[in-house]
Amino acid sequence: MKYRFKSEGGTPIDQTIPDTLCRVATALAEPEQDSEFWKEKFYKALTDFCFLPAGRIISGAGTERNVTLFNCFVMGNIPDDMSGIFLALKEAALTMQQGGGIGYNFSTLRPKGSPVNGVGADASGPLSFMDVWDSMCRTIMSAGSRRGAMMAVMRCDHPDIEGFIEAKQEPGRLRMFNLSVLVTDDFMTAVKEDTAWNLSFDKTVYKSLPARELWDKIMRANYAFAEPGVIFIDRINRLNPLNYCETIHGTNPCGEQPLPPYGACLLGSINLARLIKNPFSEKARIDEKELTLLVTTAVRMLDNTIDVSQFPLAAQQKEAQAKRRIGLGVTGFADALIMAGVRYGSSQAVNLTEQWMHTIQRAAYWASIELAEEKGSFPLFNREAYLSSGCIPNLDDDILTAIKGKGIRNSLLTSIAPTGTISLFADNVSSGLEPVFSFTYTRHVTMPDGTRRDEQVSDYSYLLYRRLKGENTPLTSAFVDAQSLSPKDHLVMQAAMQKYIDSSISKTINCPESIQFKDFKDIYVTAYGLGCKSCTTYRPNAV
């Protein structure tokens, strides 16, 4: 088992999954005055995989090893000088050594060919330093058996953006990175109005080109190579509840957590598939009282994780404890829809998404308000500024009134992670917001000795349906997989969920290979119009 605690010699200390869950519950209850009471509450939330903390928490909590319980970090801004660049590289290496993935914004580095004062040379540009980061990542294994992940972003107005867009088209280059372009509102307006776009650095314009030409380069790279992703950075900052005290320039490797410099990504997911009562019947539903209680416990567990976790860097600890940001999300979402008899992407699915996520949003914010009353608000809480910032004014009136009177423990509370590995751990429920990729498939598993083994796996809802209805009963119309859905089906679900998520969503929009380029470009424009914070697509091709 991936998350089993083992001795240095490889002998299992966790003998069973309940042992692992008990270890995690015990560790996360340590900050409580009545730790035994909360240990039992936390363990109950973890049983049957109802609440799934992120992998770093499951594997590291209670082991006393020098690892972080935060999955990912956005690192500090890279100074535009050699000593600062390699200090940033050192910080990245130390973070990855403890098991954290990292995000970096390379827009702060001067473009290739710019003069370097005092040395009589020209700058090699940000892409050359990304190669150095890539080499570093190749040599560092994260804690346990988890390889490091990295996200590199660059602003759409950086002079080297065209090279950035095409960087991974070179065989073998930057394979340890995910790449995304930070797209501004001004750029989207320039694309719409077909005006010129300046590429500049430090107030110097290096090139001007039609905005649509640059947009087409981004789109064609995605059409053929599935990268770079698009992040609507102005929308992210505009809707950030902390925009009164921070500016976001990057995201964690999967994109669900836009973060400020040294920001940390603490994740956990409610497994909706485990909460459906009377599955595959007309009475199928989620018990909203049970969901609310589970969310309340999960928020407390994640908040405690901030206090028990180690941090690779002091700056990361300071940032996390000053803002107490958490990212509570969902997994098993598509399975829950199937069990409720609802087709992913349908209007009924959109309505159910909003109903479930509104319940989760309310429960999470109320839990954090109650924690603030008990333990205090996050240190950088400014009542007037917080209540008027970002997405906070859109919350229900009773929540706003409660925050005004009692404060709030956590600055941000919700995020939708991809949850690939923990979903497999939880009996192969569907991942995050994603539709079921395939109801039965072969998974290639790398073993501890480096060998690979093929395993036949089936989706959770599919196996449950077969157990309840029999092997020969036809599947219902709700059994749709990613390949049978249109891009619009994906988009409406992402947009519906984003309304109730204060951070962001990791989501891939699967496209048919036959999709026309014009229709492909429309996906991104539609995502922007629907209020999404980012857009990532995958179109299968021979590359």
Can you describe what each PLM-predicted range is?
Residues Q33-F42, G101-Y104, G144-M151, G229-F232, ...:
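Flexible, glycine/charged-enriched surface loops at secondary-structure junctions
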